[in-house]
Amino acid sequence: MRNILAVSLVLTAVLAAAIAAPRAASPSSDYTIQAIRYAELPDFPLSELVVGGPQGEKIDIAMVIWLIRGEGRNILFDSGFHRQSWFKYFPMKDFLQPDEAVKLAGVQPEEVTDIVISHAHWDHMGGIDLFPKATVWIQKEEFRYYTGEAWQAGGHHGGIDPEDVQELVRINTEGRLRLVDGDNQEILPGIRVFTGSRHTYASEYLLVSGAKPFVLASDNCYLYRNLEKHMSSATFSEADHQANIQNQARMIELAGSADRVVPGHDALQFQRFPSEGRIAKIR
């Protein structure tokens, strides 16, 4: 009788624990990931991408947005740009406006359901107005800083377009903005964002889970060379270089392999993964 009672108590405890435990995140094995190159920026100084890199060396960098499809959603990681004012500073080659670029992958601009913004720089947040029905996700601290303190005395807003900031505020007033509160947050089933790299005030990178998880780094890791040489990307301040390097190691750990960390501006992603035209099939 005592044995039966003991077994009953154990089974009851196990059942209670199972009910109380949070549901596991979706494995999201059905998510596909495509890199879409919407432009190329030629002859860019390598030393501005790899801190401590060789002076005088220049490379052509890819301007990229990433399309993630699954769970009934069309998700963009970053939105590119289109404002003419930036072309005089950064003469692009082979430019195709981001809303036109996603059509090459079979998605209409109004079919984009979500845009996850890695950071507020002009070439990553500058296309949010091109996708009229998308919910936009950005770190709460990134939003707070670049809609306020960045423009005060002592603030830093290099690379931030005031028109993009105004657009972000407008999207918020429309109810289409979601503010992410910090590190290691699942914002959609199987989609997590992580902070700590400090490319900007509160930049984030993205993990797409599944049997073979992938990390999309955006500018938190510009190039494969950053990963291979353990060298920092540009950061909010020089004091953040070490945190950037540490987060590159974290990206590899999250992805399970350096081969599944996709840098933000490296044209090699279109060679390392099956590609056709402007589109590389990451997964």
Where are these regions (language model features)?
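Bacterial N-terminal signal peptides
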Residues: V7-A17
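Cap/insert and terminal regions of metallo-dependent hydrolase folds
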Residues: F95, S203, L207-R283
